[in-house]
């Protein structure tokens, strides 16, 4: 799939002085997809779930590849100002480097093929935008999103549903490795999904819960993290389902390019993480790479390495990890080694890193009151 497949998703107004293009939304063309019974909806949900499970297994989440390409094109451009280059850059979407945007667009394509079996599905599916780390939920949901104060850093697939007169929304979120259909009913009754455990790692268990709010225009997504010492933290995100999102490439994919974390994640059909590579970008010093993988016995192994060590690749321990990770990520060893070496060159370019983090700061400032 290429960006050109999605005409109209890359263009958005970009006011001078604003760090991102303004997000744009469309209008729904019809009513929610109607089901005479819960059983008929369950038939659809089973088909949707199979599709999302196949997708998360077949495609890695990869925000490293698109970032490396962005850096190389910036260097080749001869530009000195990253912000100027960023404003004119059109982020391509390729299946080797899918983030939440590419995964959601790919899933939309696949699900629309089910329209013969479930008439109205193709026209009912839409992209929903999501704002993360919300401090004041009540204030946020009292209005439609303000284009100038949101960053819309995440997208997912949604479908409005009507089950015997009961309204709700079905969500599919391959970008966050959710390999199931999340059903959110207004009355919170079956088939409402409720809370479920998304991941259970030795250091932390993540539980997700979803509920409709804001007169049905928003889904409140709560991420509850329980540490092994008993400490619990709950994060709130808001998914806007009031209108279909029309700028996933121009806004969300572009925003992802300057985020201060890079990751490459392999998943199984249940959304379990088979391998992860994560790099948080500090303002100074050598970034740390955190890697983990599932062993054949189901045990989770985890290590940390300085990013610069991926340039020479002389450490036998790193070579061993690259080989194991490449297998879990369904990549060739040389491909993964080159990708990590390229990432190291990009992030050890201190002028580039400083400009990158400055853009990220500007975006965070715009959305700081959400």
Name what the model sees in each region.
Residues 61-64, 98-108, 154-157, 171-176:
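Long, contiguous hydrophobic alpha-helical segments, chiefly transmembrane helices and signal peptides
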Residues 127-288:
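His-Asp-centered catalytic microenvironments across diverse enzyme cores
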Residues 75-148, 152:
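Active-site neighborhood of thiol-dependent amide/isopeptide-bond enzymes
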Residues 4-96:
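Secondary-structure boundary elements
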Residues 24, 29-32, 41, 45-56, ...:
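Hydrophobic, Leu/Ile/Phe/Ala-enriched alpha-helical segments that form helix-helix packing faces
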Residues 115, 159-163, 295-297:
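Short acidic, glycine-rich loop/turn motifs
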Residues 237-370:
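Extended, charged low-complexity segments
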């Amino acid at each position: 799939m290429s960006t050109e497949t999605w005409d109209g998703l890359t263009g958005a107004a970009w006011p001078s002085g604003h760090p991102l293009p303004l997000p744009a939304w469309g209008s729904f063309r019809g009513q929610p997809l109607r089901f005479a019974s819960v059983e008929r909806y369950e038939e659809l949900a089973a088909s949707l779930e199979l599709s999302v499970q196949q997708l998360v297994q077949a495609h890695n989440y990869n925000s490293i590849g698109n970032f490396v390409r962005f850096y190389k094109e910036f260097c080749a451009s001869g530009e000195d100002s990253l912000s100027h280059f960023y404003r004119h850059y059109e982020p391509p979407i390729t299946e080797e480097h899918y983030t939440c945007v590419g995964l959601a667009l790919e899933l939309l394509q696949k699900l629309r093929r089910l329209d013969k079996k479930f008439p109205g599905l193709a026209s009912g599916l839409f992209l929903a935008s999501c704002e993360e780390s919300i401090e004041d939920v009540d204030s946020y949901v009292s209005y439609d999103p303000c284009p100038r104060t949101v960053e819309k850093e995440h997208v997912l697939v949604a479908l409005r549903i009507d089950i015997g007169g009961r309204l709700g929304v079905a969500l599919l979120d391959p970008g966050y490795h959710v390999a199931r259909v999340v059903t959110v009913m207004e009355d919170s009754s079956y088939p409402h999904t409720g809370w479920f455990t998304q991941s259970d790692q030795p250091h932390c268990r993540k539980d997700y819960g979803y509920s409709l709010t804001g007169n049905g225009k928003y889904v409140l997504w709560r991420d509850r993290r329980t540490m092994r010492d008993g400490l619990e933290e709950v994060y709130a995100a808001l998914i806007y389902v009031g209108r279909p999102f029309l700028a996933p490439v121009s806004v969300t994919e572009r925003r992802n390019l300057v985020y201060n974390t890079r990751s490459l994640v392999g998943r199984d059909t249940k959304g379990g993480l088979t391998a992860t590579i994560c790099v948080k970008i500090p303002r100074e010093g050598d970034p740390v790479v955190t890697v983990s993988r599932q062993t054949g016995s189901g045990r989770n192994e985890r290590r940390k390495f300085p990013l610069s060590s991926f340039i020479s690749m002389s450490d036998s321990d790193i070579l061993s990890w690259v080989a194991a990770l490449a297998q879990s990520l369904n990549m060739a060893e040389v491909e993964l080694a080159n990708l990590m070496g390229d990432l190291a060159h990009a992030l050890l370019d201190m002028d580039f890193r400083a400009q990158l983090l400055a853009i990220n700061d500007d975006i965070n400032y715009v959305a700081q009151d959400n």
